[in-house]
């Protein structure tokens, strides 16, 4: 009985770090940084860079808004030119967001009406990782 109890305690001690790591990563706060000059979106989770994606930003006459905004709405499904997902931003003076594009050749340029364009696969990957409220 004593040996069984010792083995059970050892098993718990060995397995616990696996579950603790999952809990820690699930509660890590993520944030998005958009560099409009470099045309790059960086996802930070905690203090680590979790992903970097090339983007397209607003054209000269319709620039991407600058500031700190939160994701406040999410849509998924086929959306024509917007790809398959949309992350809406709480920009007070307009309807802007992060979304895919059916014009992947525009990535790396100033081509949108102010939104942040991504390759469809990149937008889907980001959509899966960030909830409403993400800055």
PLM ranges: what are they?
Residues 16-24:
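Membrane-interface motif at the C-terminal end of an N-terminal transmembrane signal
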Residues 25-60:
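A structural motif detector for short, solvent-exposed N-terminal "entry" segments of globular domains
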Residues 23-31, 59-68, 73-135:
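Exported/periplasmic cell-wall-interacting domains
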Residues 8-17:
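Bacterial N-terminal signal peptides
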